[in-house]
Swiss-Prot record:
GO terms for cellular component: plasma membrane. The keyword Cell membrane applies. Keywords: Antiport, Cell inner membrane, Cell membrane, Ion transport, Membrane, Potassium, Potassium transport, Transmembrane, Transmembrane helix, Transport. Interacts with the regulatory subunit KefG. The gene is kefB. Pore-forming subunit of a potassium efflux system that confers protection against electrophiles. Catalyzes K(+)/H(+) antiport. It is a multi-pass membrane protein. This is Glutathione-regulated potassium-efflux system protein KefB.
Length: 601
């Protein structure tokens, strides 16, 4: 691909992402499916803007590489050792059982046994990029099902090595390709990478950080990620596995958060590129000529993997409420299938359209996962949000919740405990299924699901409640929920958490006057204590705190019309000077009034 063509492709990718992803999110089908549909639209079987899919697909695998590096940063070696049973137990069982079942089914459709074995192994793998992205979206990272899912994905990355080595053996060309000397050299090189990374990475980054130049630190981080990926690729191993190991080696270093910050923007863009490339690779010609075969194969693939994963989760002791999440998120085929099937095709293991059929099956199975997870969410919502007992009656006056609390993280838990301590009837809405299980044990009335769904709010008693407290982590979710409540439940008193001044402006513009900036009150309290340590009388420090709170809120309201204006920054500076002048003037009037306490407003 020439330079101008590469630039044009980049512009097309960005345009497709900007156009498709917001639309997909608005339709409620998720960003991942939006990327896939965008890829179909601009690919060779869509509008035909881009035809060199293989080259772009190979480049876009860097998105998975960056993602695995960040995941490695979140896992220290001791944590990885704790996962050994799930990695080599559940992970190995999933690959072997799924591969055996799928290979047997492929043999029934006129695949040779060699091609069926390769096909079964390739289909048994899941998409690391899609599964990890969905697990993050569903907040499964810290749950039991999320940890187990990650273990399975990690074993699949490890299984890449023997799977690729198996292809020439099945093709009957082992003598030409199976060189024990080369294998020994690769093992030594891999061990050398581990030892070198263990003892050299931290001193190198310490030296780079001492320069104080942020751009150099970012460049060094990119060099580490791309270099380790290239090194592993040269050894014939998984690039993602190499960067994951590099991340683990730096997980306990003092540079962990800085490394993650430097990599995160690249990871997001390249992951989007990967999903677009997968959409582009969908062969609509094969789909059209073999429609029935492909549809049946996608259904069978997803069903077999869900069955195997669900049974393994049950044997492993995963909670029943989390088994379907675990099975659903790993039910698709994966990006490794593209590599394995291409290698097998070069060894002439496949006949006719067999490779194309398998690749179409993998691509379509990846497209079903976001939709499948939405169905799983609805099923879990019915399971958790139905009557707790069969003879439970509809709401009566004494059972109606007075307050609905959306989100039960650390912020929401404090509010919930305060309300419960004062005998208030509350209902909690939470998207983290592990938190739902835990809160139910403590006697909270908790509903699982997305609070931006009107039906869930009704089920939770929004029509009978007096107030709703919104403590979402994401500002977009907060504003969407405010809009829904104002439209469908206008009687509710809306109270919201604002993560900062910008979100506070947005809430005020939306008509929400009861909100709390999560760091503002605690910062004011610490400031009051600081004034006391500097010799100010406690009563005077309290008044200073109250005046500052009142005047800051006034300035916040005055700046609402300028929230999106280009002169906002200069006006904010003027407001700060006015605030200081008014504050000093009013405090001088209060200096001799050292007794009495005002109330917070």
């Amino acid at each position: 691909m020439e330079g101008s063509d590469f630039l044009l492709a980049g512009v097309l990718f960005l345009f497709a992402a900007v156009a498709a992803v917001p639309l997909a999110s608005r339709l409620g089908i998720g960003a991942v499916l939006g990327y896939l549909l965008a890829g179909i639209a601009i690919g060779p079987w869509g509008l035909g803007f881009i035809s060199d899919v293989d080259e772009i697909l190979h480049f876009s695998e860097l998105g998975v590489v960056f993602l695995m590096f960040i995941i490695g940063l979140e896992l220290n070696p001791s944590k990885l050792w704790q996962l050994r049973r799930s990695i080599f137990g559940v992970g190995a069982a999933q690959v072997l059982l799924s591969a055996a079942l799928l290979a047997g089914l492929l043999m029934l459709t006129h695949f040779s046994w060699q091609a069926a074995v390769v096909g079964g192994i390739g289909l048994a793998m899941s998409s690391t990029a899609m599964a990890l992205q969905l697990m993050r979206d569903k907040r499964m990272n810290r749950s039991e099902s999320g940890q187990l899912g990650f273990s399975v994905l990690l074993f699949q990355d490890l299984a890449v090595i023997p799977a690729l080595a198996l292809v020439p053996l099945l093709a009957g060309s082992a003598d030409e390709h199976f060189d024990w000397m080369k294998i020994g050299m690769k093992v030594l090189a891999f061990v050398g990478m581990l030892i070198g990374g263990r003892y050299l990475l931290r001193p190198v980054f310490r030296f780079i950080a001492a320069s104080g130049v942020r751009e150099v630190f970012t460049a060094a981080t990119l060099l580490l990620v791309l270099g380790s990926a290239l090194f592993m690729d040269a050894l014939g191993l998984s690039m993602a596995l190499g960067t994951f190991i590099a991340g683990v080696l730096l997980a306990e270093s003092e540079y962990r958060h800085e490394l993650e910050t430097a990599i995160d923007p690249f990871k997001g863009l390249l992951l989007g590129l990967f999903f677009i490339s997968v959409g582009m690779s969908l062969n609509l010609g094969v789909l059209y000529t073999h429609l029935l075969w492909v549809v049946i194969s996608v259904v069978v693939l997803v069903a077999v993997k869900i069955l195997v994963l669900y049974l393994l989760a049950r044997l492993y002791g995963v909670r029943s409420s989390e088994r379907m999440q675990f099975a659903g998120v790993l039910s698709q085929g994966g990006e490794f299938a593209f590599v394995l099937f291409s290698t097998a095709s070069s060894q002439r293991l496949f006949q006719g359209d067999q490779m194309a059929l398998l690749l179409v099956t993998v691509t379509l199975s990846m497209m079903t996962t976001p939709l499948l997870m939405k169905l799983v969410d609805k099923w879990l919502s019915r399971q958790f949000n139905g009557p707790e007992e069969e003879d439970e009656k509809p709401w009566v006056n004494d059972d109606k919740p007075q307050v609905i609390v959306v989100g039960f993280g650390r912020f929401g838990q404090v509010i919930g405990r305060l309300l419960m301590a004062n005998k208030m009837r509350i209902t909690v809405l939470e998207r983290d299924i592990s938190a739902v299980n835990l809160m139910r044990k403590y006697g909270y009335k908790v509903y699982y699901g997305d609070a931006t769904q009107v039906d869930l709010l009704r089920s939770a008693g929004a029509e009978a409640a007096e107030s709703i407290v919104i403590t979402c982590n994401e500002p977009e979710d907060t504003m969407k929920l405010v809009e829904i409540c104002q439209q469908h439940f206008p009687h509710l008193h809306i109270l919201a958490r604002a993560r900062g001044r910008v979100e506070a402006h947005e809430l005020l513009q939306a008509g929400v006057t009861q909100f709390s900036r999560e760091t503002f009150s605690s910062a004011l309290e610490l400031g009051r204590k600081t004034l006391v340590t500097l010799g100010m009388h406690p009563h005077q420090a309290q008044r200073a705190q109250l005046h500052f709170r009142r005047l800051d809120m006034r300035m916040l309201r005055e700046l609402i019309p300028m929230h999106a204006d280009t002169v906002q920054i200069s006006r904010a500076r003027e407001a700060r000077r006015e605030l200081e002048e008014i504050f000093q003037r009013e405090m001088q009037q209060e200096r001799r009034q050292l007794d009495g306490w005002d109330e917070f407003e």
